[in-house]
Amino acid sequence: MTIRTLTPIEARVLGTLMEKARTVPDSYPLSLNALVSGCNQKTSRDPLMEVNDDEARAAIDSLKAQSLVFEGSSSRVPRFEHNFQRAAGVNEPQAMVMGLLMLRGPQTAAELRTNGERWYRFADSAAVEAVLLELQQRGEDGGQATVQKLPRAAGAREQRWVHLLCGEPDIQALMASAPTTAEAEGLLARVTALENTLARLKADNAQLRSHVLNISEQLGIALPETLDDAHDHSPN
């Protein structure tokens, strides 16, 4: 299936669902509140966004029309899940790098490997590069072009990759915004350490809340509304 050009908000919604499916499975599929919260995270997102409920709902409806997102009906709160792998005809490693590129912008193979450790574990950066080349080859073989390798930025050791689901990228702007090698490596190390710590804490918190809610349902105990609402906001 050929995916039509996505808007930045549609790409953010889709990428967020793909991320949360792997990183907080106990809270997945996501409610609208949790999805909006994930879209607007201040970490692991580039660029930062302020997506509101109406914008997220419009993006969901558009993605549903392409079978990229499904809406569940088994819960009192509508919940949403992605169908990217099947709709796009990609495997799990390919979906992982596409999701990361949608959420965090242009990245090198090494950055994708580090940033995606909680999604999928690659043996090394060469394995990530091989997946990116597979996606690039799909476009060269007559399929839909989904990724592009950017020219090497001044002072950079590696070339970055960008996704094409939102159309042709502005190469000049991307090259102008590329960090230097020292800046990129230092920032990546600090951010990765903080994100890994935060992600572990949030995953533990989401799992605990899920267990409490399950036990309360089994015992027929009504929990305070604040805890129930927190369950919908937990995956960040």
Swiss-Prot record:
SUPFAM superfamilies: Winged helix' DNA-binding domain. It comes from the Bacteria. Pfam families: DUF480. InterPro entries: DUF480, WH-like_DNA-bd_sf, WH_DNA-bd_sf. Belongs to the UPF0502 family. HAMAP family: UPF0502. This is UPF0502 protein Bpro_3844. It comes from Polaromonas sp. (strain JS666 / ATCC BAA-500).
